[in-house]
Amino acid sequence: MKTWQGNSEAAGMAVLRPGWAESDARLTVNYGERRLRTELARGRALLWSGDWQPELRLDGELLEPTSPWKNVCWVSDDDADYLELEQKLSGGARVQRHVLLAREDRFLFVADAVLCKRPAAIVYRGMTPLTQGVRFAAADETHEGFLTSPAGHRRHALVLPLALPEWRSAGPRGEGLAVQDGTLELRQSAIASRALFAGLFIDLALRRIARPATWRRLTVAEDRRIVPGHLAVGYRVQVGARQWLFYRSLGRRGSRTLLGHHLVTEFLAARFNRAGRVEPIMEIE
């Protein structure tokens, strides 16, 4: 079992973990080459392991990496471990990966921001390599699902695709979470857009994931005008009584509001306290 926690640019590896109990989650990310590799474990259970590279198409053309992954930001504090990586792609595009493992809140947030030089049709496939001892159990009517034991008797995590509508009937055909050859795929697309944001909220609190969950995309405003999705996105997540807020600026920065919360930052992950106020877990300016 790996006991180290931290980030080494020289080794191209980061290990994120919320604590040191044997049952705590542990995420390893190897980013020193052109393809990401990952491993997520909880105690003795290995939930996923292998290639973590997204697949992207721009106007039908498959994009190829033109650089290794670069460490853009690493923060480890009392609230979370946070890793941000960036890779350049053919066609002048870039993909930025956010990875946040919250300590007290016990969730993993993984998201890709795809940034293009011109408006284009973007097709995205984010792939998570599940191990043989883990299956994805999709909900019947909504886009959520659970990582479970092979027989489905034990749940390891709740998975919510934040950029997609909660109900399948409200989303575009072909988009959502699906398993292909043992890999959990998140499929999304955007039409005539300069950016796409694809995020997963993965709840690792075993007692909490049995409770009802809901999420929705929020309206981002600037100067009393709605900000389009290629410039900024925001999401609200609720599992049981706990609620969180996520925000990412995708274009030029500005003074914006989200559920009445004012911000000028690039990235925000926050919780709502009992009084309904926003408490930042991680804020990147």
Question: Which residues make up each language-model segment?
Answer:
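Catalytic and substrate-binding regions of extracellular carbohydrate-active enzymes
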Residues: M1-H153, V227, L268-I284
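Short, surface-exposed beta-strand/loop "edge" segments at domain boundaries and coil↔beta transitions
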Residues: A21-R26, R44-S49, S90-Q96, A120-I122, ...
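Polar low-complexity intrinsically disordered regions enriched in Ser/Thr and small residues
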Residues: Q53, L63, C73-W74, P129-T131, ...
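Tryptophan-centered motif/residue detector
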Residues: T66-N71, L108, T183, A210-L218
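Beta-strand/loop-rich accessory regions of lumenal/periplasmic or secreted enzymes
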Residues: A113, R125-M127, A137-R194
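Short glycine-aromatic motifs
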Residues: Q132-A137, E166, P212-W215
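Short Pro-Gly-centered flexible turn/kink motifs
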Residues: A190-L204
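Non-catalytic terminal regions with compositionally biased, polar/charged low complexity
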Residues: A205-E285
